[in-house]
C-alpha cells in the first residue's frame, strides 16, 4: 500500500462551517403522517395515491350539460311553426301588395267569336256617348249659313237702334251725359281741415310706432340700482323657460362606463352566444342551412381528344371514314398509274423490237393490193395511246400501201400473234375495248386489297391508354393486322400503327 501511494500528496479539507447540501430550512417541521408516508408526500405535486372518481357525480354533470345543450338548440334553432306568417301561413306584412293569392280567379276576356259586336260605340249600331268628341257634331246637325252683309239690319248694333250695345261698352268709358267737375284753385281751398281736423292731425294716417308730444319716457336704471336676485330663473337661479334643452344642471351625476373586464359579454348580438334577430340580414343564411357541395369529378379525356376542340369532335369522327376511303382511292390510283406507265414502257419497247424485225424481213412489197381480213384478237391491255395510230386505218384503200404504214400496221398483230397478217379496210375502233379497261381496274383494286393484309372492322369504340396503342370508333377498318397474342393484336387505323384489344374487332372474310 505504501508503494501505491508514494509520490502523491493527498490533502482532504473539511468545511464544516458551510451551508448544508440539502438547503433545509432551519424552521422546517416534518409533519408527515404515517398514511402520507405510505401513500406519498403531499409536498410533491402529483405524488401519492390518487382518489377514485365519483361516477354518480360524473353522470349527473353529463346529464345537466346535455339538458342545457338541448334547451339551447331549441331556443336558437329554426322553428318550423314560425315563418312567413305563423304556422303554415304567409307573413302579411311582407307579402307583395300587387301579388294575388291562390284563391284568385282571373276572368278571361271572351274570344272575338263570342263578343256581341252590336254593342259598341254607343249601343246597337250607335256611338258610345261618353267617348264622343265634345267638339264633334252628329248627323242631325244642320248648319245655318250666315247672311250676307247686304242682308243684315244695322239698325240693331252697338246698343239698339242707332245706339250702342250696353254689354259691349267699355267700363272706363264715359257717355255723352257725363259732366266733369273742375278742381278748385289753391286759393279757394280751406286748409283748416287737414291732418286730423281743424289744426290737428288725421288719426288714421298717424304712424303706429310714432309717439306724441304727451309721451314721457322713463330713464333706465343704472347697473348699480338693479336687483339681480331675479335673473335667469329667480333668486340666484336660472330661467327655466330660457334654459337649453340639451344642457345639464348641477344636479346631474355622470355614470362612468364599465371597463372591458367588467362587461358581461354573454349578452351580445342576440343574447347568450346568439345573434340579434332584428339586426340580422334577411338575405344571410345561418349555419343550420346546409348547401350541397357540387362534385369536382371530371370525366377522363383521352390523349387524342385533347388536341381537338369539342365542337369539332363529331365532325372529325364523321369525316374520318370518308378521308380514309379517299386516301385509299388515291393510293390505288397512284399504283394503277405507276403500273400503267410500266406496261406502256414495256409495250413501247416491244413495238420497237417488232418494227426492227419488220424492217429486217421487208424486202419485197406484197403481191396483191387487196388486204386479207384481219383475225379477231383480244385486247392485250387497256392502253389508251393505241387508239391514235388506229384512227388512220379507214384511209387505207389505195392499191399500193405506203411502206411506213404497212410496217407500222404489220407490227401490231405480231404483238398478239407471231404471224404477219394484213389489216382490213374497215375502221377497227374496237381495239380499245372498255370492258378490258374496267377489268384492269378491278385487277388493280384486287391487288391493292391484297396488299392491306388481314383486315377487321371495329365493333366498339376504344381509346388508347398508352403511346403504343391506337384508338378507333365503331365500323372503323383496321388493316395490316398482326396477331401477336390471343388478346392483343397490332394494326393500322387512321394513319396510326399500334396495339389494340382483339375482342373489340371482327375479322373480315
Swiss-Prot record:
It is found in: Cytoplasm, Cytoskeleton; Cell projection, Lamellipodium; Cell projection, Ruffle; Cell projection, Dendrite. Residues 393-406 have a biased composition (Low complexity). CDD domains: SH3_Cortactin. Acetylated. Its main location: cytoplasm. Pfam families: HS1_rep (PF02218), SH3_9 (PF14604). Disulfide bonds: none annotated. The modification Phosphotyrosine is found at residues 384, 405, 429, 445, 448. Cortactin repeats lie at residues 80-116, 117-153, 154-190, 191-227, 228-264, 265-287. It is a peripheral membrane protein. Residues 451-509 form the SH3 domain. There is a cross-link at residues 144, 181, 218 (Glycyl lysine isopeptide (Lys-Gly) (interchain with G-Cter in SUMO1)). Changing residue 445 to E: Promotes reorganization of the actin cytoskeleton and cell motility. Detected in liver (at protein level). The modification N6-acetyllysine is found at residues 87, 107, 124, 144, 152, 161, 171, 181, 193, 198, 235, 267, 272, 277, 309. Keywords: Acetylation, Cell junction, Cell membrane, Cell projection, Coated pit, Coiled coil, Cytoplasm, Cytoskeleton, Endocytosis, Endoplasmic reticulum, Isopeptide bond, Membrane, Methylation, Phosphoprotein, Repeat, SH3 domain, Synapse, Ubl conjugation. There is a cross-link at residues 144, 181 (Glycyl lysine isopeptide (Lys-Gly) (interchain with G-Cter in SUMO2)). Residues 320-359 have a biased composition (Basic and acidic residues). Part of a complex composed of NEDD9, AURKA and CTTN; within the complex NEDD9 acts as a scaffold protein and is required for complex formation. Interacts (via N-terminus) with NEDD9. Identified in a complex containing FGFR4, NCAM1, CDH2, PLCG1, FRS2, SRC, SHC1, GAP43 and CTTN. Forms a complex with ABL1 and MYLK. Interacts with SHANK2 and SHANK3 (via its SH3 domain). Interacts with PLXDC2 and SRCIN1. Interacts with SAMSN1 (via SH3 domain). Interacts (via SH3 domain) with ASAP1 (via Pro-rich region). Interacts with FER. Interacts with FGD1. Interacts with ABL2. Contributes to the organization of the actin cytoskeleton and cell shape. Plays a role in the formation of lamellipodia and in cell migration. Plays a role in the regulation of neuron morphology, axon growth and formation of neuronal growth cones. Through its interaction with CTTNBP2, involved in the regulation of neuronal spine density. Plays a role in focal adhesion assembly and turnover. In complex with ABL1 and MYLK regulates cortical actin-based cytoskeletal rearrangement critical to sphingosine 1-phosphate (S1P)-mediated endothelial cell (EC) barrier enhancement. This is Src substrate cortactin.
Amino acid at each position: 500500500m505504501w508503494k501505491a501511494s508514494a509520490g502523491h500528496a493527498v490533502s482532504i479539507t473539511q468545511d464544516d462551517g458551510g451551508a448544508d447540501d440539502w438547503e433545509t430550512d432551519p424552521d422546517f417541521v416534518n409533519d408527515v403522517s404515517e398514511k402520507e408516508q405510505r401513500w406519498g408526500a403531499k409536498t410533491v405535486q402529483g405524488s401519492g395515491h390518487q382518489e377514485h372518481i365519483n361516477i354518480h357525480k360524473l353522470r349527473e354533470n353529463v346529464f345537466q350539460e346535455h339538458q342545457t345543450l338541448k334547451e339551447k338548440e331549441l331556443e336558437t334553432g329554426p322553428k318550423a311553426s314560425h315563418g312567413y306568417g305563423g304556422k303554415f301561413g304567409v307573413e302579411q306584412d311582407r307579402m307583395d301588395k300587387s301579388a294575388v293569392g291562390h284563391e284568385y280567379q282571373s276572368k278571361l276576356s271572351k274570344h272575338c267569336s263570342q263578343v256581341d259586336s252590336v254593342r259598341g260605340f254607343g249601343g246597337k249600331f250607335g256611338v258610345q256617348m261618353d267617348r264622343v268628341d265634345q267638339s264633334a257634331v252628329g248627323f242631325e246637325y244642320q248648319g245655318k249659313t250666315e247672311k250676307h252683309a247686304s242682308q243684315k239690319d244695322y239698325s240693331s248694333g252697338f246698343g239698339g237702334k242707332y245706339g250702342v250695345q250696353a254689354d259691349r261698352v267699355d267700363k272706363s268709358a264715359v257717355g255723352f251725359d257725363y259732366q266733369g267737375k273742375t278742381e278748385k284753385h289753391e286759393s279757394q281751398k280751406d286748409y283748416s281741415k287737414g291732418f286730423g281736423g281743424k289744426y290737428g292731425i288725421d288719426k288714421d294716417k298717424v304712424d303706429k310706432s310714432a309717439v306724441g308730444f304727451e309721451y314721457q319716457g322713463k330713464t333706465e336704471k343704472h347697473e348699480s340700482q338693479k336687483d339681480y336676485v331675479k335673473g335667469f330663473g329667480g333668486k340666484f337661479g336660472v330661467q327655466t323657460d330660457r334654459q337649453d334643452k340639451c344642457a345639464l344642471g348641477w344636479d346631474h351625476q355622470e355614470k362612468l362606463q364599465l371597463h372591458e373586464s367588467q362587461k358581461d359579454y354573454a349578452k351580445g348580438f342576440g343574447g347568450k352566444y346568439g345573434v340579434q334577430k332584428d339586426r340580422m340580414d334577411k338575405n344571410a343564411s345561418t349555419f343550420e342551412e346546409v348547401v350541397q357541395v357540387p362534385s369536382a369529378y371530371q370525366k377522363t379525356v383521352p390523349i387524342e381528344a385533347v388536341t381537338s376542340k369539342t365542337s369539332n369532335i363529331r365532325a372529325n369522327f364523321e369525316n374520318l371514314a370518308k378521308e380514309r376511303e379517299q386516301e385509299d382511292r388515291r393510293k390505288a390510283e397512284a399504283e394503277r398509274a405507276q403500273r400503267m406507265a410500266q406496261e406502256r414502257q414495256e409495250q413501247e419497247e416491244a413495238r420497237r423490237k417488232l418494227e426492227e424485225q419488220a424492217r429486217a424481213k421487208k424486202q419485197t412489197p406484197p403481191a396483191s393490193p387487196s388486204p386479207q381480213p384481219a383475225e379477231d384478237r383480244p385486247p392485250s391491255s387497256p392502253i389508251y395511246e393505241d387508239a391514235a395510230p388506229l384512227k388512220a386505218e379507214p384511209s387505207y384503200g389505195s392499191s399500193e400501201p405506203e411502206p411506213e404504214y404497212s410496217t407500222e400496221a404489220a407490227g401490231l398483230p405480231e404483238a398478239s400473234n407471231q404471224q404477219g397478217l394484213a389489216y382490213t379496210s374497215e375502221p377497227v375502233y374496237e381495239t380499245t375495248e372498255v370492258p378490258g379497261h374496267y377489268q384492269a381496274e378491278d385487277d388493280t383494286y384486287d391487288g391493292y386489297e391484297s396488299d392491306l393484309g388481314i383486315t377487321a372492322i371495329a365493333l366498339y369504340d376504344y381509346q388508347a391508354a398508352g403511346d403504343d396503342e391506337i384508338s378507333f370508333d365503331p365500323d372503323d377498318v383496321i388493316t395490316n393486322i398482326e396477331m401477336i397474342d390471343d388478346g392483343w393484336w397490332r394494326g393500322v387505323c387512321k394513319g396510326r400503327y399500334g396495339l389494340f384489344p382483339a375482342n373489340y374487332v371482327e375479322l373480315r372474310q
